[in-house]
């Protein structure tokens, strides 16, 4: 019986909480208002303030009653409670004026303060910073919004310091108002808290100003910043010298450290950053990071409980606007703040978003969640079969060890989709957003999340969970998500869902728990509410009153505020000593060298703590013995996979331990006690012997170069950078189909986890530089549009992968065509054929566009003026046929399909043209060209004696309105060559530029246009082409260069001496016998390698030799030119691989086909070279690359270390950033000192293409260029008159040895009337002069070799031609009459003054030369008499000649009659035509020596 009574008592005792919960009803008070947008509470009080639409209201009873505050009449923008005086002081900022109100008595009274803003604005957005000790010290920052008459918005920023409003002092940067705008203006007190350990006095202020100037011509920006410090409360400032020449992005003042982020490149706002750390605001040191940091989340620089700095690194700089959750990576420093390392529990080192939370009241506790980079929009939710799993973990030992969030919930165990008893495969996953505003409690917390294995995160399945042990174990409490908060140190928990049911109805009740989440009661609200805020009225979580705000769901929504009071629960009973228990953090283990515990109420106790306004108290007991968890790796060491600290030689080189030692080695302890650790007895640490002989000496440039090595078990077969300035992202693929991604030029590399699916191909979008597509072996395609940070998984159509490349739209990123095989059980099956599948949504859905299509182009997006924007062209190969046709459509072949050519070999697009190869009779080819997709014209190739059948041609590209084409004339394998042709502007008429240009069997040609410079082309010709064609010898190649787009060619001028200062063996004056020859495009291992770089203007590398012909590759050396090919220098003996960095500011050479441990580099444009040892063991470097724009300072080497077993394939990232003292200063206006100057390339100071151009070159090798777009700032300093070099030969004309263009014998010039057919609106046409102007030329005036002859009417346009060029008879008559009058007057004047006055014609024969009988009274008389004498002479000579001719003719006639009797005489022919023809030919020959004209 006694046992029964005891059980009964226990049962009743257990039910009491439930009865109390059901019987108790919190006191709820509702107030309605028009619009409540802000509500704040004073610390340790029941006073609240809220802003309504028209007024400011205050409550002194935790929100039950409200009244309007008198004295504040303007509309309020925001409230701020002083974080250091939260009990009594607050600020209210006015929206429409530079004004704010201050209260020092919990809102009972307010006083206005007006800020003396220098400029008027439409709106003012101000904030205030208070001092933790000095109450009167304030910093005010205001953003001034103005909108001009054109509607353009401008935001100005001003900062003031004030002594509680008595006086104001504006803080300004020294650069004042300049072009651009102040993008950053910020000031803070160095003392950020009462217990701050930073140096400096209490009045120290740190300010940052940053100006961003936009360069409209290039679309780039220039940043300038100033970081200044005041030691007297803002009265005077001085710039921090360490940051004088740097761009400071931002800073953060923490308790133990000041963190400053500087931008590496002032001309690239997305460039990497350095992290500077100081603990005294006097000296700053650069912290080491595993990779360069580019984007640090705003407001995401914090310190954890032991003072380590935590950085949240995002993929974009401004993450607030991103639809993606969280950061891309989280870095945590050592306790000194000088070395950062990433969180190591990320699965497979994959890329994804990371959220980290570390509640300040839970010492050593970290929460972390990892989410793979899969976009979470509704459109992509169907692709939830992610290849990387979600991970959510907790650590209670400062991140040393991590565990999954274990679900312990027997009641709901069957409601989860996995076995929660196996937390390694079934655990809780969440984002931890809710922990950011967590109220202090002894281990009690709530979060929203889902339970699973991490393969799917469905937002619709989120539920609410609770934990009582700081997150180690969790229990389900609600099958929905909503707002929640705690009171009475976790003993009161409130919860209201976002929606009350699956239909999304507005909540009409809230839930509460009085036993730490064990049981729940509910309360029905008077009015349903859409909740948006639920808070405790006391910020420290110790109170029992709450505020719930939201809006009503009515036609005219209003704001609802509920005040909820739990103070009467348990009949107002307060807890006694027996109602409490000890709760230990980290299960009682040592954390930071101490054990921590809280006193908290027992879960079932029938009382409240009721110690309102008293913070949660933590008990600390130092641990006696130090363990490994109390230590961290010393700066020079990093942890390996086993967790041991091992030496890192990059860190050793950065430190000064070897500089301080004179010995060859130094002893260093690998572990150091964590700063601030509480343990009493230190461990014994065995030092490690560090060799110093391999460490570069202090002051050497090698010490500043940083090399990072990565090892692979399989060879990297594919690699390609994304062509952007945002970062140095690239994709790599090894020989077994594993893909790797790096965002820092290969410094850190992570494998892309595809859940075992191999990647068979990687395709980059040529039109959108951040997009790439990875094809999986199981039919998946992995798409990225942000350079590999995130991926979307799409399922390819149910078709066999044929390995055909994707075809992309040039204007729509998500539109592309995929080719799959249909009926392809076997690839050799006759039924197997290709099908073109179209997607317009980035691969979410595919539609079958065209059967049997093997290659398509979005033609409408390629042409400048397309006939239809939606036009698509496809090459079709029907089943059971070898014939291919070209078809087009304007609706993706739904209803429109047009056959363009019935039979083609293939087609391609280049530079706004589409060129089609069409078979012709006798196994010849013909080319047809279009630039609008509608009209095709046959490409007319020039006649030449060495062009036979058109068997093969290669399109070499199109630039500046011309197509370059190589037409093969000899196709014998291994001895291929042909003619280099160039088209006119519409691509239809070609002329020969050079003969016997080398090509290989695959159609590649030794042809390369020098990037960034106009008209410079390098080719290799077969100098003995006739013998090769007759099989009488092997090819002998020679290198030629043109500086005027192919009109004139010359051999390369050889250097006088080699790299060792010795003269070359051949020194003939004739370049034909002694010139420089380079190996060309046909011999390249990687076709992406080029002589030149588009950013290193004028620079070219090549492997070749000096002599009469090109020697084999292994016998050649490496040459460099810096003036566009005019002069060359041998820089290294033997063949080398090369790469350009920093626009040519850094040049790198690596031996080719030879093992090495060093590279050679130059920072003075190749004048001098230095060697740098990048590895300990020699490796065979197979390639050296950098970003496509050659603007980076990091280079990536791919090598193979033979005979080294596992990991023999290596990559080396070599970073040259630190060898430069500063960034070059660039001033686009030219008004300020800069490190650049304009100069012509080489010695050429004459004109080229009708203008004289100068280019920017840096003048100081100690600075680096960065992202300055130098190629955009070339300038034309002079426009020139046209010369022979501005013209090339027209169609069917060839360049003769004398430099003139002559018509090919037996041919006629192009029929000018053909243009009338192509352009029906034309009225006239012109015949060719034999010359045409080079499209690149801008010359004006001067020589007009292309001057047209008289116009001719187009057929059928004769009437319009006569109307355009009418014959004006009146004008002709007027001119004729005028000429006759002038002649008549002149004749009369000569007769009157020279003949009549001197006796008339009767004296005509009496006048003799020198006769003084003529009247000469003045100069006019003398001139007239001279004319008379000349006339007399001519008359006498003519008369005499006529008489002689007459006599001779008579005599000759007599002889003829005597010989031939009465036979008919011969027909007389005039010699005039023949004589004039000979004279014309002689004159033409004389004037045709145009080569004598010089530019």
Swiss-Prot record:
Keyword Repeat attached: yes
Positions of BNR repeats: 58-67, 101-111, 229-238, 394-403, 465-475, 511-520, 740-750, 837-847, 1119-1129, 1161-1170
Stretches of the chain found on the membrane's Cytoplasmic side: 1391-1495
Keywords: Glycoprotein, Golgi apparatus, Membrane, Protein transport, Receptor, Repeat, Signal, Transmembrane, Transmembrane helix, Transport
Recorded topology in the membrane: Single-pass type I membrane protein
Side Lumenal, residues: 23-1369
Highest taxon of source: Eukaryota
InterPro entries reported for this sequence: Sialidase_sf, Sortilin_C, Sortilin_N, VPS10, VPS10-sortilin, WD40/YVTN_repeat-like_dom_sf
Annotated localization: Golgi apparatus, trans-Golgi network membrane
Residue spans crossing the bilayer: 1370-1390
GO cellular component terms listed in the entry, alphabetical order: cytosol; Golgi apparatus; membrane
Note: Present with 319 molecules/cell in log phase SD medium.
Chain's role: Functions as a sorting receptor in the Golgi compartment required for the intracellular sorting and delivery of soluble vacuolar proteins, like carboxypeptidase Y (CPY) and proteinase A.
Name of the protein: VPS10 homolog 2
Lineage start: Eukaryota, Fungi, Dikarya, Ascomycota, Saccharomycotina
């Amino acid at each position: 019986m006694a046992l029964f009574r005891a059980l009964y008592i226990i049962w009743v005792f257990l039910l009491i909480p439930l009865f109390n919960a059901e019987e108790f009803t919190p006191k709820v008070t509702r107030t309605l208002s028009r619009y409540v947008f802000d509500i704040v509470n004073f610390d340790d009080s029941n006073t609240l303030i809220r802003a309504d639409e028209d007024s400011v209201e205050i409550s002194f009873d935790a929100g039950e009653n409200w009244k309007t505050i008198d004295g504040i009449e303007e509309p309020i923008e925001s409230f701020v409670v002083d974080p250091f005086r939260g009990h009594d002081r607050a600020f209210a900022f006015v929206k429409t004026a530079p004004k704010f109100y201050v209260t020092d008595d919990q809102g009972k009274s307010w006083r206005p303060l007006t800020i003396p803003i220098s400029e008027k604005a439409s709106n003012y957005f101000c904030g205030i910073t208070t001092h933790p000790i000095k109450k009167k010290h304030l910093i005010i920052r205001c953003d001034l919004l103005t909108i001009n008459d054109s509607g353009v918005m401008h935001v100005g920023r001003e900062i003031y310091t004030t002594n509680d409003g008595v006086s104001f002092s504006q803080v300004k940067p020294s650069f004042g108002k300049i072009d651009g705008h102040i993008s950053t203006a910020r000031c803070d007190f160095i003392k950020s808290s009462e217990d701050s350990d930073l140096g400096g006095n209490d009045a120290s202020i740190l300010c940052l100003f940053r100006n961003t100037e936009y360069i409209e011509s290039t679309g780039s920006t220039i940043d300038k910043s100033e970081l200044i410090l005041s030691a007297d409360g803002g009265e005077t400032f001085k710039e921090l010298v360490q940051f004088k020449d740097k761009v400071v992005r931002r800073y953060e003042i923490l308790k133990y450290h000041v963190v400053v982020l500087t931008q590496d490149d002032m001309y690239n706002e997305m460039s990497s950053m350095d992290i500077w750390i100081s603990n005294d605001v006097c000296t700053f040191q650069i912290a080491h990071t595993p990779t360069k940091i580019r984007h640090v989340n705003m407001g995401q620089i914090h310190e954890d409980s032991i003072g380590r700095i935590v950085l949240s690194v995002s993929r974009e700089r401004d993450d607030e606007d991103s639809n993606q959750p969280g950061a891309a990576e989280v870095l945590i420093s050592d306790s000194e703040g000088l070395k950062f390392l990433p969180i190591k529990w990320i699965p497979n080192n994959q890329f994804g978003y990371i959220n980290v939370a570390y509640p300040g009241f839970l010492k050593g506790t970290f929460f972390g969640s990892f989410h793979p980079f899969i976009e979470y929009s509704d459109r992509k939710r169907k692709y939830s079969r992610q290849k990387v799993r979600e991970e959510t973990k907790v650590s209670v030992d400062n991140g040393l060890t991590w565990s999954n969030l274990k679900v312990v919930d027997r009641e709901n165990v069957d409601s989860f989709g996995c076995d929660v008893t196996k937390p390694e495969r079934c655990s809780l996953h969440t984002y931890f957003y809710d922990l950011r505003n967590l109220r202090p409690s002894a281990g009690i917390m709530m979060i929203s999340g889902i339970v699973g294995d991490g393969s799917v995160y469905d937002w619709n399945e989120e539920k609410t969970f609770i934990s009582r042990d700081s997150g180690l174990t969790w229990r389900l409490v609600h099958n929905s998500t909503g707002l929640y908060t705690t009171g009475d140190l976790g003993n009161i928990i409130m919860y209201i869902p976002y929606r009350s049911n699956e239909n999304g109805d507005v909540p009409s009740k809230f839930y509460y728990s009085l036993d730490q989440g064990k049981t729940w009661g509910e309360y029905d609200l008077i009015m349903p509410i859409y909740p948006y805020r639920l808070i405790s009225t006391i910020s420290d979580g110790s109170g029992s009153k709450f505020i719930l705000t939201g809006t009503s769901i009515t036609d005219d929504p209003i704001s609802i505020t509920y005040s909820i009071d739990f103070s009467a629960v348990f009949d107002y009973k307060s807890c006694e000593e027996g109602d409490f228990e000890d709760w230990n953090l980290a299960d009682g283990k040592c954390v930071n060298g101490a054990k921590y515990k809280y006193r908290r109420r027992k879960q079932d106790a029938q009382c409240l703590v009721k110690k309102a306004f008293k913070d949660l108290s933590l008990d600390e007991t130092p641990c006696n013995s130090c363990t490994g968890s109390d230590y961290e790796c010393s700066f020079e060491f990093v942890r390996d996979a086993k967790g041991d600290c091992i030496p890192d030689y990059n860190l050793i080189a950065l430190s000064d331990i070897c500089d301080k030692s004179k010995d060859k080695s130094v002893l260093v302890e690998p572990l150091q006690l964590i700063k601030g650790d509480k343990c009493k007895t230190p461990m014994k640490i065995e030092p490690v012997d560090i060799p110093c002989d391999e460490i570069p000496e202090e002051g050497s440039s090698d010490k500043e170069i940083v090399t990072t090595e990565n090892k692979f078990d399989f060879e990297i077969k594919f690699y390609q950078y994304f062509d952007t300035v945002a970062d140095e992202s690239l994709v790599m693929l090894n020989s077994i189909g594993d893909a790797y991604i790096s965002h820092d030029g290969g410094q850190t590399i992570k494998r892309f986890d595809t859940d075992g699916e191999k990647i068979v191909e990687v395709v980059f979008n040529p039109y959108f530089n951040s997009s790439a597509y990875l094809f999986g072996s199981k039919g998946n395609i992995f798409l990225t549009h942000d350079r590999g940070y995130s991926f979307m998984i799409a399922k390819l159509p149910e078709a066999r992968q044929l390995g055909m490349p994707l075809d992309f739209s040039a204007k729509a990123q998500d539109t592309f065509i995929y080719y799959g095989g249909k009926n392809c059980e076997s690839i050799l099956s006759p039924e197997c054929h290709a099908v073109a599948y179209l997607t317009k949504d980035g691969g979410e859905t595919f539609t079958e566009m065209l059967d049997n299509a093997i290659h398509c182009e979005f033609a409408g997006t390629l042409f400048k003026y397309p006939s239809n924007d939606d036009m698509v062209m496809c090459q079709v190969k029907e089943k059971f046929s070898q014939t291919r046709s070209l078809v087009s459509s304007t609706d993706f072949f739904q209803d429109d399909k047009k056959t363009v050519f019935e039979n083609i070999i293939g087609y391609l697009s280049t530079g706004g043209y589409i060129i089609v190869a069409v078979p012709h009779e006798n196994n010849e080819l013909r080319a047809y060209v279009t630039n609008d997709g509608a009209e095709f014209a046959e490409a007319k190739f020039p006649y030449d004696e060495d062009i036979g059948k058109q068997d093969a041609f290669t399109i070499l590209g199109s630039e500046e309105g011309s197509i370059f084409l190589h037409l093969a004339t000899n196709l014998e394998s291994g001895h291929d060559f042909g003619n280099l042709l160039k088209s006119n502007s519409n691509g239809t008429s070609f002329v020969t530029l050079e003969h016997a240009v080398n090509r290989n069997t695959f159609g590649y040609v030794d042809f390369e246009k020098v990037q960034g410079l106009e008209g410079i082309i390098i080719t290799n010709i077969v100098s003995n082409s006739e013998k090769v064609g007759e099989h009488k010898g092997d090819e002998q190649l020679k290198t030629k260069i043109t500086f005027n787009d192919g009109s004139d060619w010359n051999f390369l001028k050889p250097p006088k001496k080699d790299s060792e200062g010795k003269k070359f063996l051949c020194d003939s004056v004739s370049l034909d016998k002694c010139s420089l020859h380079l190996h060309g495009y046909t011999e390249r291992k990687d076709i992406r390698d080029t002589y030149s770089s588009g950013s290193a203007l004028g620079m070219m590398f090549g492997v070749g030799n000096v002599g009469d012909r090109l020697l084999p590759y292994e016998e050649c050396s490496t040459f460099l030119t810096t003036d566009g090919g005019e002069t060359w220098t041998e820089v290294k003996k033997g063949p080398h691989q090369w790469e350009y960095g920093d626009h040519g500011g850094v040049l790198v050479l690596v031996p080719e086909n030879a093992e090495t441990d060093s590279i050679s580099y130059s920072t003075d444009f190749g004048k001098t070279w230095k060697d740098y040892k990048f590895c300990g063991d020699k490796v065979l470097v197979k390639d050296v690359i950098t970003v496509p724009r050659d603007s980076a300072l990091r280079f990536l080497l791919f090598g193979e270390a033979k005979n080294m077993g596992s990991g023999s394939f290596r990559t080396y990232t070599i970073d040259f950033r630190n060898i430069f003292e500063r960034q070059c200063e660039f001033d686009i206006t030219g008004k300020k000192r800069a490190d650049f100057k304009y100069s012509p390339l080489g010695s050429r100071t004459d004109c080229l293409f009708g203008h004289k151009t100068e280019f920017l070159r840096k003048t100081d090798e100690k600075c680096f260029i960065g992202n300055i777009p130098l190629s955009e700032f070339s300038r034309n300093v002079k426009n020139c008159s046209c010369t022979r070099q501005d013209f090339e030969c027209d169609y069917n004309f060839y360049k003769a040895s004398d430099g003139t263009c002559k018509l090919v014998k037996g041919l006629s010039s192009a029929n000018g009337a053909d243009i009338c057919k192509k352009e029906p609106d034309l009225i006239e046409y012109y015949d060719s002069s034999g010359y045409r102007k080079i499209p690149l030329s801008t010359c004006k005036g001067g020589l007009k070799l292309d001057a047209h002859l008289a116009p001719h009417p187009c057929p059928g346009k004769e009437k319009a031609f006569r109307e355009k060029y009418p014959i004006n008879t009146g004008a002709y008559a007027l001119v004729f009459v005028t000429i006759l009058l002038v002649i008549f007057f002149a004749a009369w004047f000569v007769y009157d003054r020279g003949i009549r006055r001197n006796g008339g014609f009767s004296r005509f024969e009496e006048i003799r030369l020198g006769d003084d009988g003529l009247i000469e009274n003045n100069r006019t008389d003398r001139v007239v008499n001279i004319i008379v004498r000349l006339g007399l002479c001519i008359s006498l000579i003519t008369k005499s000649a006529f008489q002689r001719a007459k006599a001779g003719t008579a005599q000759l006639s007599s002889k003829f009659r005597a010989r031939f009797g009465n036979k008919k005489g011969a027909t007389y022919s005039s010699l005039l035509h023949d004589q004039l023809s000979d004279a014309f030919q002689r004159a033409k020959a004389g004037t045709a020596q145009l080569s004598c004209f010089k530019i």
